[in-house]
């Protein structure tokens, strides 16, 4: 078997066999296939696409290129959720404890933030003392004991994906549905969960900007999971505006605790309710309606909040900050005022995320430090009426000199008008193995 022939085969639009796909991924991972040939192969995939079967096999080969997490020591169904990334997206901190409190095990590996999007691991580490790196034995023991553990990605998960992504990044082959889907799902397959709910963000703050593209990505990832024996579904959710009102690590954790205590922002609560109920349904806990009732009861009884505190406590976190919101505050705050009255018609969510990074809440390079107290709290969002000079948001930072540029970026993200805008639904579609349902 020669890589040259497989490049030509894909270039000409033919499907590759399982053996051929395994040869490509294995050879590239171990260094037998050089970058220049893999670059040509990736461009052929970008231009010609892949069938669901090809994509599923490539994803499995990528997953098996490194460590496969063994969750067999955890009793019962193991569930996971994954978000494609957004601004103010703190849903894991609500959904995971709710689902665990309903009797479904959550053994989850999460990522860090990069660019304008935040990461669950960074948010968790804003709780003083919280460890997000656990030995596998402790990770599994904790899930068996309290039903939940959320940690950072560890070990050598899907090294083929890391090498492939580095090439895609410099060869103009990022925006390919089979390549994006296999990149995400290779790590999900390697992480070992039985049930996976995907939260595919769409809109100006998301990686996928249009609903059709987001549904195509969701459908491809669901097909990958199904072909590889996992129960997978996806919700396509709106990211044309930040989720909730807090953007920044400790600010978002505090807001998540409000949701778990039944007093969080309506939009964040609604999205978390839909995600949790769909994940519970995948795990066999009933219909969506029955699982929505489980969500409501887990919140109203306080059980989900107690589960969340138990997780942070088990991982060394100071749970007093979860109970009373006593996170370290930024040294300085700055109020951004509305330049005119009327209505907030739209927001450029990516720019709001960039403004939070400028304040120190995120990173532009993987090695950048994060200020857990920095960020933005939004007073006005798309669809809100506003008076001239009224507070739009409060910016938080430890360096006053950061406010001027961040405020300019933030204000440029806001569009005002004289009439109330029509807003899209928070959940725009549900994708399962058998259908795509638009809302």
Short names for language-model regions:
Residues 144-195:
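Phosphate/diphosphate-binding glycine-rich loops and adjacent basic-rich segments that engage nucleotide
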Residues 47, 93-107, 187-192, 227-228, ...:
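Alpha-helix C-terminal capping segments
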Residues 59-83, 136-166:
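Self-splicing inteins and homing endonuclease
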Residues 77-100, 104-116:
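Glycine/serine-rich anion-binding loops at beta->alpha junctions
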Residues 1-88, 259, 309-314, 318, ...:
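Acidic, glycine/proline-rich low-complexity segments that act as flexible tails and inter-domain linkers
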Residues 109, 143, 151-154, 184, ...:
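Short beta-strand segments
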Residues 5, 10, 15-18, 28, ...:
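Well-ordered secondary-structure scaffolds
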Residues 123-149, 219-225, 229:
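A glycine-rich helix N-cap at a beta->alpha junction
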């Amino acid at each position: 078997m020669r890589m040259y022939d497989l490049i030509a085969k894909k270039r000409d639009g033919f499907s590759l066999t399982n053996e051929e796909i395994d040869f490509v991924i294995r050879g590239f991972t171990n260094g037998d296939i050089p970058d220049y040939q893999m670059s040509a192969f990736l461009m052929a995939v970008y231009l010609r696409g892949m069938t669901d079967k090809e994509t599923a096999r490539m994803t499995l080969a990528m997953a098996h290129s490194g460590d496969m997490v063994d969750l067999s020591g955890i009793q019962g169904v193991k569930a996971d959720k994954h978000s494609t990334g957004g601004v103010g997206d703190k849903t894991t901190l609500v959904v995971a404890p709710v689902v665990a409190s309903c009797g479904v095990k959550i053994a989850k590996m999460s990522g860090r933030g990069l660019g304008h999007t935040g990461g669950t691991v960074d948010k968790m580490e804003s709780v003083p003392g919280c460890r997000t790196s656990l030995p596998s034995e402790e990770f599994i023991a904790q899930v068996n004991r309290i039903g939940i553990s959320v940690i950072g990605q560890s070990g050598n998960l899907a090294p083929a994906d890391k090498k492939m992504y580095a090439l895609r990044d410099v060869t103009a082959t990022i925006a390919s549905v089979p390549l994006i889907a296999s990149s995400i799902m290779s790590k999900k397959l390697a992480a070992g969960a039985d049930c996976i709910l995907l939260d595919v963000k769409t809109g100006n703050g998301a990686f996928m900007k249009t609903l059709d593209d987001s549904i195509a990505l969701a459908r491809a990832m669901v097909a990958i999971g199904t072909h590889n024996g996992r129960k997978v579904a996806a919700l396509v959710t709106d990211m044309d505006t930040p989720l909730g009102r807090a953007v920044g690590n400790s600010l978002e954790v505090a807001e998540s605790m409000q949701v778990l205590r039944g007093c969080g922002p309506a939009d964040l609560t609604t999205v978390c309710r839909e995600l949790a109920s769909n994940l519970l349904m995948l795990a066999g806990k009933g219909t969506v309606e029955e699982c929505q009732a489980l969500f409501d009861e887990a919140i109203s009884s306080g059980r989900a909040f107690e589960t969340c505190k138990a997780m942070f406590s088990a991982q060394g976190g100071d749970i007093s900050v979860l109970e009373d919101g006593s996170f370290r505050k930024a040294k300085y705050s700055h109020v951004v005022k509305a330049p005119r009255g009327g209505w907030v018609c739209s927001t450029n969510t990516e720019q709001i995320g960039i403004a939070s990074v400028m304040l120190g809440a995120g990173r532009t390079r993987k090695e950048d430090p994060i200020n857990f107290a920095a960020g933005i709290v939004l007073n006005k969002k798309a669809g809100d009426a506003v008076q001239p000079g009224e507070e739009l948001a409060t910016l938080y930072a430890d360096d006053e000199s950061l406010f001027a540029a961040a405020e300019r970026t933030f204000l440029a993200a806001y569009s005002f008008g004289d009439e109330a805008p029509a807003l899209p639904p928070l959940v725009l579609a549900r994708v399962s193995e058998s259908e795509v349902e638009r809302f």
